[in-house]
Regions:
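Amphipathic alpha-helical assembly/interaction segments
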Residues: 2-85
């Protein structure tokens, strides 16, 4: 779970530092994918009793919110054709 969460922020940072639209989009999409991976790992952790129901709900909501924000960022970049930070 830690690796997936770290991958989200690392890919956002790397995408932010890229100049080309395609590179930015690629890293933001990778970050979003890591968010979905984290959601799966949270479910497995709950199912194997490594997380309580309360912890699962809180962490899943944070992950969903982050994933939605990333989706909006990607949509905005595509819609506006932004190529700079």
């Amino acid at each position: 779970m830690e690796r997936s969460a770290l991958s989200i922020t690392s890919n956002i940072a790397e995408g932010f530092g890229r100049q080309s639209f395609q590179d930015k989009k690629h890293f933001y999409i990778m970050a979003r994918g890591s968010g979905y991976e984290l959601q799966n790992q949270l479910l497995v952790a709950k199912d194997t009793s490594r997380l309580t129901d309360v912890e699962y709900k809180e962490l899943t909501q944070l992950s969903l919110d982050s994933t939605r924000l990333l989706h909006g960022l990607i949509r905005s970049l595509v819609k506006n054709g932004q190529t700079n930070s």
